[in-house]
């Protein structure tokens, strides 16, 4: 990421108008006019509605799409990695190594704890939210807003198959209510071997050329236990994309920070990102050491290592962007320009002139709390058993409160996902749990200090390893009773969840006791941050959004919020150090790149199928679509709304995309639809899937009446 200069020009994106191809647009504010002006095609409302209904969100942090009328869903292999590894553990297999294909629907395997959401309705609730908090004191802002959002979400629906979320857009300039259909019976249908899904491993991650078949197919099942019968789904493209072709990506980008102030950018650069990188580097090293114990330990922890390495590279890329002097100077110039425009208008100056200084003060206060907050509220998440125990303790405490007073994650609209997460029948590995909890407790002691009252009270005379071993080996949270359909029907977790606070308080389970010992202090620092920092900051960001609207208008896109967005772009390579990077790779290139050793070792299925594959078939390609983490698994469609590719990554320059879009260098990376079909057919013998995909057509997906050319 040496050449950052082109990114500087892109930094006007959150302040005025966006470049062509830039933006993660909401479906109710998509710039069809701009697309038509640039490319001669106007996505109509029917086209947009169809694509929206065919797009789904994986609640754990990815995107996906419906690709048949029988609930078949396409996403990335790395988005289904947890499902693949959980099923491997439960079935004493290694589907990550060997791949998985269900030859019949009866063989499709339920993914523990997996949830998908389909966006069905968007409603503007800005006035109600802003009116409720208008005269609120800064220290009460968070509580009042939380109660307001909880009430809106509860009114929207609380049934298990409904999920409602109030989404904050433009840092508080707008609030939309998103209503979803919720699906919690998701079954694995197809996944290739990890050696081809993640060919090139961490060295090739966020790079291009790539030769990855990063795909998984799962199926949504209805409440009747049968495959979903869905009216909307995407048809498969029967043509090949060419350089310069128009492309659209529909997905759920996790989050960007393009609308922050300079004080917040500096905090990211100087404290938040370095802190994250240190944590992730240590986690990567610790997991790598664990993997060296043996093949089984490696299998158990592959998902952990993938997440650590991926996140570390993302954080490094973000830090490099903010550490670039010219980039930072342009950020400062942009803020100076907006402040000058505000101060030139007496009315705007009176309303918004103090926002930047107030935010800077809140950033300093946040820094003072950060160490304790990260240690207590975030620091023990690497242990799945501790996470479950804390969830059960908090569930017991929160359910006795009115909906509006609960922690956000325990609001009525979020309870079905919380329950599924806490009760999910996933394999638990004692050795891995002891190792990760030992590391987490060691970090807790180091971060707070050995003489900290919390450390003295919780640790006593015991070491982190002793606490972890006792809690993991003697907890009864591991044992789950499930029925023939994979539903949890018994076990301590269910008993404590159903029994509420009384049952949790009476429990002497060592993992519950550990969570209970830490929770009062964790809650206290969380409440302090939410009351003294988050609430006042939300008020100031809301004012800043109004200032931007007043100066620049509202024709821009909001920062990403892990909600459904649509971006447009074209198939296009880029220039790297004076050399052209072509936009496509082909199947033959994968065999040329293979070395026979990890991470460039092709699976046996590909080696034995080489003569059946066309070496000229497009494999991976890049486009100018504006994406970010969370877009993994997004369908890439052509102007006909047909599947032409599957997003799985961005190039190295896209890592600065949190803070700006660079039209000359930022690229999205996708698997070509052609190789998806060819591999399923000629490598994996998945003819039933190929037939299901190619037979699934709709009149609208053909594009004839969906838009204008």
Language-model features: locations:
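Terminal presequence/propeptide segments associated with secretion/organelle targeting
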Residues: 2-4, 15-709
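Sec-dependent N-terminal signal peptides
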Residues: 6-11
């Amino acid at each position: 990421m040496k050449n950052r200069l082109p990114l500087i020009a892109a930094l006007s994106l959150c302040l005025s108008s966006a470049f062509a191809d830039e933006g993660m647009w909401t479906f109710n504010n998509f710039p069809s006019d701009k697309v038509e002006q640039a490319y001669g095609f106007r996505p109509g409302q029917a086209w947009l509605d169809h694509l929206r209904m065919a797009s789904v969100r994986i609640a754990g942090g990815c995107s996906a799409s419906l690709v048949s009328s029988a609930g078949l869903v396409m996403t990335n292999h790395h988005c289904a990695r947890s499902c693949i590894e959980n099923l491997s553990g439960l079935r004493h297999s290694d589907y990550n190594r060997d791949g998985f294909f269900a030859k019949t629907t009866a063989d499709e395997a339920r993914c523990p704890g997996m949830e998908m959401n389909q966006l069905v309705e968007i409603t503007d609730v800005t006035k109600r939210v802003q009116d409720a908090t208008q005269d609120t004191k800064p220290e009460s802002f968070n509580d009042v807003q939380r109660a307001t959002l909880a009430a809106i979400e509860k009114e929207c629906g609380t049934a298990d198959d409904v999920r409602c979320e109030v989404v904050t857009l433009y840092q508080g300039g707008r609030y939309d209510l998103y209503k979803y259909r919720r699906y919690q019976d998701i079954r694995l249908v197809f996944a290739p071997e990890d050696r081809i899904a993640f060919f090139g491993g961490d060295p090739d991650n966020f790079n291009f050329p790539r030769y990855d078949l990063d795909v998984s197919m799962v199926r949504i099942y209805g409440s009747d236990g049968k495959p979903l019968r869905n009216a909307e789904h995407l048809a498969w493209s029967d043509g090949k994309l060419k350089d310069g072709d128009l492309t659209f990506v529909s997905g759920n980008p996790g989050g960007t920070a393009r609308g922050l102030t300079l004080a917040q950018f500096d905090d990211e650069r100087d404290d938040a990102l370095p802190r994250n990188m240190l944590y992730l580097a240590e986690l990567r090293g610790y997991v790598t050491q664990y993997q060296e114990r043996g093949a089984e330990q490696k299998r158990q922890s592959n998902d952990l290592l993938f997440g650590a390495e991926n996140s570390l590279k993302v954080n490094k890329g973000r830090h490099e962007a903010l550490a670039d002097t010219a980039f930072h100077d342009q950020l400062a110039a942009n803020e100076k320009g907006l402040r000058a425009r505000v101060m030139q208008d007496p009315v705007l100056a009176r309303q918004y002139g103090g926002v930047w200084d107030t935010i800077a003060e809140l950033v300093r206060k946040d820094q003072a709390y950060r160490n304790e907050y990260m240690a207590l509220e975030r620091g023990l998440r690497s242990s799945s058993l501790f996470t479950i125990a804390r969830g059960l303790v908090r569930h017991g405490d929160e359910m006795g409160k009115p909906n509006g007073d609960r922690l956000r994650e325990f609001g009525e609209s979020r309870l079905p996902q919380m329950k599924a997460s806490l009760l999910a029948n996933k394999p638990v590995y004692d050795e891995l749990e002891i190792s990760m909890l030992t590391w987490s407790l060691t970090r807790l002691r180091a971060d707070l200090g050995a003489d900290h009252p919390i450390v003295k009270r919780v640790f006593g005379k015991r070491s982190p390893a002793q606490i972890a071993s006792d809690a993991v080996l003697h907890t009864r949270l591991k044992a789950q009773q499930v029925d023939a359909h994979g539903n949890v029907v018994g076990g301590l977790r269910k008993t404590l969840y159903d029994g509420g606070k009384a049952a949790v308080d009476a429990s002497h389970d060592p993992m519950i006791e550990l969570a209970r010992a830490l929770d009062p202090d964790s809650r206290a620092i969380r409440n302090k941050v939410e009351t003294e920092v988050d609430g006042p900051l939300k008020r100031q960001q809301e004012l800043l959004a109004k200032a931007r609207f007043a100066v620049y208008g509202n024709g821009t896109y909001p920062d990403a919020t892990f909600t459904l967005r649509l971006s447009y772009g074209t198939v296009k390579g880029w220039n790297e150090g004076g050399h052209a990077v072509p936009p496509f790779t082909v199947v033959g290139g994968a065999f040329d790149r293979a070395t026979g050793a990890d991470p460039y070792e092709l699976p046996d299925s590909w080696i034995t199928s080489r003569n059946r594959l066309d070496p000229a078939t497009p494999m991976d390609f890049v486009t100018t679509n504006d994406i970010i983490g969370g877009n993994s698994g997004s369908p890439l469609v052509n102007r006909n709304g047909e599947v032409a590719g599957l997003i799985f990554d961005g190039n190295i320059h896209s890592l600065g995309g949190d803070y700006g879009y660079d039209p000359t260098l930022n690229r999205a990376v996708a698997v070509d639809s052609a190789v998806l079909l060819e591999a399923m057919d000629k490598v994996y013998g998945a003819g039933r899937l190929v037939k299901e995909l190619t037979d699934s057509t709709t009149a609208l997906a053909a594009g004839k009446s969906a838009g204008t050319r």
